[in-house]
């Protein structure tokens, strides 16, 4: 009789405790790529209220903070949960896609890059806002930047092709929520972290349809 009671208690605990533990885990912490390739650094977005978290880089396996992304980039609140980190293959750089403070009637997403110097992470030169609206030699001559609305500015790191080369996604959003154009920009870094856009691929109509 006693063994039957123990069995029932164990089953009850498994059913009751299992979902509770899963709900306590932060969805941001489970994102793929939060751990650097060399497994020395960890991206974390610690929840301080339901739906709110503060992003940071920790030394893996510890609570020691290496970069306070909340403090440095003013990214917090519910939009911080949508932020994303992509590590360079050698773990010496990372790109952080996030939404900084902006007016409520606008949408603004950009990327910040950091580089490891010694044992310290240093912020690199920020990419300019409204990148597609600026006159640039790398954009095709037939492209009209005026078709891109100022109320929706988006620039995201898509992937690292090697330790010094990043591919950025830069869409041009139109006034009627359409996507008249989008570009994949190739960003090249030198040893000290200076970057330069060396190529701009205008996405085809088929590629745009796949994005939408």
Please state what every model-predicted region is.
Residues 28-89:
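Short N-terminal edge-element motif at the start of the domain
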Residues 1-7:
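Bacterial N-terminal signal peptides that target proteins for export
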Residues 1, 13-16, 87:
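Compositionally biased, low-complexity segments
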Residues 12-34, 48, 109-212:
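Acidic, small-residue rich beta-repeat scaffolds with periodic aromatic anchors
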């Amino acid at each position: 009789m006693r063994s039957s009671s123990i069995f029932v208690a164990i089953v009850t605990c498994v059913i009751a405790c299992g979902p509770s533990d899963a709900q306590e885990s932060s969805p941001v912490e489970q994102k793929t790529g939060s751990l650097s390739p060399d497994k020395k650094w960890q991206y974390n977005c610690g929840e301080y209220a339901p739906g709110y978290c503060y992003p940071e880089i920790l030394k893996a396996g510890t609570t020691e903070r290496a970069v306070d992304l909340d403090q440095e980039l003013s990214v917090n609140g519910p939009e911080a949960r949508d932020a994303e980190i992509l590590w360079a293959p050698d773990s010496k750089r990372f790109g952080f896609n996030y939404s900084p403070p902006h007016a409520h009637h606008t949408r603004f997403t950009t990327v910040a890059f950091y580089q490891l110097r010694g044992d310290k992470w240093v912020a690199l030169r920020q990419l300019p806002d409204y990148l597609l609206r600026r006159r640039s030699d790398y954009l095709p001559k037939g492209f009209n930047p005026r078709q891109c609305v100022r109320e929706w500015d988006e620039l995201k790191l898509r992937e690292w092709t090697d330790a010094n080369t990043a591919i950025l996604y830069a869409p041009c959003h139109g006034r009627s929520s359409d996507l008249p154009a989008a570009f994949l920009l190739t960003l090249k870094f030198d040893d000290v972290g200076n970057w330069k856009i060396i190529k701009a691929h205008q996405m085809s109509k088929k590629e745009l349809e796949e994005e939408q």
